[in-house]
Structure formats: structure tokens, C-alpha cells
């Protein structure tokens, strides 16, 4: 399935306190806290990264998913949605489930791609009915989208380097949700977990190569506690 993804992240200081607000705001719990592991693939010359694309294989709740993401790439999108740019992260996402993630990874490697980065987290998924999305963004991109998209999403990610929330939905809904949760828009970010990891490595001088619980001591403690 191909779709336009509009999202924004913000760091969380008190995950339980934030999550306690969700039911009163009309959010529904879709997926309880679940371990997620992601592997990014690229060429030896990092051609995907250079063009701001990702190729990812994800394991989440016993389901394997392959995803390709690329920039939206049209001036019309930027003018319509991002004010001021780059307020939101906007990408085109093509995604589908697969039966055997490791086998798909082997296929990628035979085609010249290699695993270049692994990142892990515990994710909790919530959603809220927000109606449908329409307008110039989706017309200009000429995407084959179903007419209604009734739910927008708020996910909580517990990573080895900290907790983050991610809002995905129409820009107006994102802004309204931030206000209802009391989140300062100035604290919001659009960086990927890969870039957040690199910034963390620079600050801490860590030798870790992946955003993984087994490579980051504090993360390893979280992992052990979660499965004990």
C-alpha cells in the first residue's frame, strides 16, 4: 500500500503520565506495549541515504513488514502543508507484510543491498477517530488512497536512548493534539531514529553501532526488565 505519511515526534519525560491522558481525549489502545526490531538496508555507497530514502524490514508482534520511504518531493506539498517548513515530516511510504523477513533480507543482500543499521524499541499504539483526509496534498501526489482515513495515530516508543511520542495524521489534528496534551511545539522534532542515535553517540562518545538494547547498557537493563 502506498500513502503519504505526515508525522511529528517529541521527547517524553513522563511516559506513564502522558499516557494516562489518552482515554479522556478519545484515544483507543490499538496495540499494547510490544517489542519491535528494525533493520535498514542500503548499498555499499549508501545511495538510498544520499537520496533520503529508506528500505526497512521490521519485526513487530510476530509480523514482518517491508517498507520503502522517500521524500514527498513536490513544491505543491511543501506550500500546502508545511508552514513554516519543515514543521512536519512528510514522506511517501510503500509498505506490505511478508511471511519471512530473514528470507527477504537475504534477497536484498543478493541484489547488492546490505544491513547497515538496526534499531529497537518497545512501541505502544493508540489511535483516534479524525474523519477523512482530502485536499491538494493527496491530489497533487496522485496517490491511490482510499477516500476515508478515519483514524490518526499516536505511538509511544521506548528506545535505548530515551522515550518518544510520534503523531501521525493531518497537520491540523497534530497541532490540536499537541495543544490538548500540553506539549510545546518548539520541542517537536522531525529527525529519524537513525539521526537521533547519531546525535546521541556524538554527545556520549558511545561505541555502539546500532540503536539496540544489547549495545547500550541502560537499554540492556530495560530489555531485561521487560522480559523478566
Give a label for each model feature.
Residues 95, 166-168:
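Active-site scaffold segments
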Residues 12, 168-169:
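Conserved residues at beta->alpha junctions
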Residues 59-61, 160, 171:
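A generic beta-sheet turn/junction motif
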Residues 1-149, 187-228:
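N-terminal strand-loop-strand beta-hairpin
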